[in-house]
Design a protein with these regions (language model features):
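The alpha-helix within a helix-turn-helix
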Residues: 18, 29, 58
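Residue-level detection of the helix-turn-helix DNA-binding "recognition helix"
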Residues: 33, 44-46, 73
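Short, charged recognition helix plus adjacent turn
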Residues: 69-99
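A short, Lys/Arg-rich alpha-helix, primarily the initiator
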Residues: 1-23, 70
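Short, basic-rich loop-to-helix N-cap that marks the start of a DNA-contacting helix
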Residues: 46-59
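Short alpha-helical DNA-recognition segment
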Residues: 23-41
Length: 99
């Protein structure tokens, strides 16, 4: 079975924005009032974007928090599908239609 590629983590998009605006992780963290490690972990795809972070990023970049959360939810669902799909197909049987 061929290994599927993981979807893009929202940290990748955040890194692109930071590059576009010439921001360091430290500068962005300071600007939005979080610890630099939080930004570093998001960019490294080791941390999810929480509602708190989404609100801060949206305010700073002039975007909306829902978009940040949608990107994160999409990523999480794709990862879950790739890692759990066969187990769920094996363990969960569809409900039978009423006669």
């Amino acid at each position: 079975m061929a290994k599927r590629l993981l979807p893009a983590h929202p940290g990748l998009f955040l890194q692109e924005l930071m590059t576009e605006y010439g921001l360091t992780q430290y500068a962005l963290a300071k600007a939005i009032g979080v610890q630099p490690i939080r930004i570093g972990q998001i960019v490294a795809r080791k941390r999810a974007i929480t509602p708190n972070t989404a609100l801060r990023l949206a305010r700073y970049f002039g975007t909306d928090a829902q978009s940040w959360l949608n990107w994160q939810a999409h990523y999480d669902l794709q990862v879950a599908q790739q890692t759990l799909e066969s187990k769920i197909k094996r363990d969960v049987h569809p409900m039978k239609e009423a006669a």
